């Protein structure tokens, strides 16, 4: 499977009020010549964690098929490693591909803080890394319908799980242990914000 980012469907989750972030994303989309992208107006709730999760869930539900879709957050910035196309032919049955990731849970203590079973793992398979317990949801290509459904269902259930922290990216990190989820060796995107840049602007290799 060849992924062509200029023609791939891309959905950017963004609050309507986030004018600066929207402008920055639109400039990047134009710079990278994205032709099939749109904003999804993020759900505004007093509970920001729930609003974030429900926005992610709704985007997945609106794209519930086996067609790849890149779901991104509005604070992303491309890196020097970005390229217009990637070939996924060498990896069969891929459910999702992370184009950006966080090294937050790479340390056992931080993984424990996020209520994960262990630190992040990365296993090289041909050109990509099979990942588990990797947090973040700022740049993911969802490929299979079954994985989209699992993420949507898991995120919704986790909001009321008394043993969890309710963050949808933690659900996704847990699901990586059950599905064929991979990441690019070099990150194509990072979160260009003070809180997350330190964790997301690092490659796997």
Label every PLM stretch briefly.
Residues 1-72, 76-205:
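An acidic/histidine-cluster motif and surrounding catalytic segment
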């Amino acid at each position: 499977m060849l992924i062509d980012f200029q023609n791939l469907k891309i959905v950017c989750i963004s609050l309507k009020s986030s004018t600066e972030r929207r402008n920055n994303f639109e400039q990047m989309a134009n710079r990278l010549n994205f032709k099939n992208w749109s904003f999804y107006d993020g759900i505004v709730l007093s509970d920001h964690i729930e609003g974030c999760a429900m926005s992610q869930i709704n985007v997945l539900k609106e794209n519930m098929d086996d067609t790849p879709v890149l779901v991104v957050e509005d604070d992303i910035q491309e890196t020097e490693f970005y390229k217009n196309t990637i070939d996924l032919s060498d990896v069969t049955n891929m459910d999702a591909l992370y184009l950006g990731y966080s090294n937050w849970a790479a340390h056992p203590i931080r993984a424990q803080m996020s209520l994960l079973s262990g630190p992040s793992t990365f296993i090289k398979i041909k050109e990509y890394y099979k990942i588990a317990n990797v947090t973040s949801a700022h740049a993911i290509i969802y490929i299979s319908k079954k994985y989209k459904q699992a993420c949507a269902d898991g995120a919704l259930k986790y909001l009321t799980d008394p043993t969890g922290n309710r963050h949808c990216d933690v659900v996704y990190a847990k699901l990586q242990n059950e599905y064929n989820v991979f990441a690019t060796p070099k990150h194509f995107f990072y979160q260009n914000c003070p809180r997350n840049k330190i964790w997301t602007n690092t490659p796997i290799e």
